Amino acid sequence: MPNHCNNTLTIKSDNTGFLQSLLNELKEADGGMPKFLEKLAPFTADINYEWDYNWCVQHWGTKWDIFDVNYASLDGDTLEVVFTTAWSPPIEALVTGMLNHGYTFNLYYEEGGCCFIGHTEGDGESHYDQTWETYTDNAPSTYIPDDVLDAFPWVESDWHDWQREQAEEEQELQDA
């Protein structure tokens, strides 16, 4: 079973037909695994246009397409999607899609099992990505931007729980 990466994505594009096709793919999947990333970065001839673990990790940034779509909405030129991926965010697929389809995007992601949180944005020509560890000696609010923490409000409370557990374990060792 993979570690699940939570993702909150916003794509903006003048090509509303393309955005509608992405939303339609999410609706047609009807709870199954949509071919969302496959629309952004399609399989290629070298893998016979079929799923391949190494290819997906290299070209999508994750081994499977998105799943557990919790929210999807299209409003004019803006598509918003909240979903899950395996182990890591689909940054490579989003960048490929951005370069091929001319959209901009913002992606916030959090992977609790691997203890990281991040933000990626693409402006249509290039992208910027920043990732932070969530379990350090310092509270996440002291080094992670508010907009990133706002996307995943449980990160701060999880850190406080972890700090409390660490203190309890240390006390047990001292008492032994």
Model-derived segments and spans:
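Long, contiguous binding/interaction regions
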Residues: 1-176
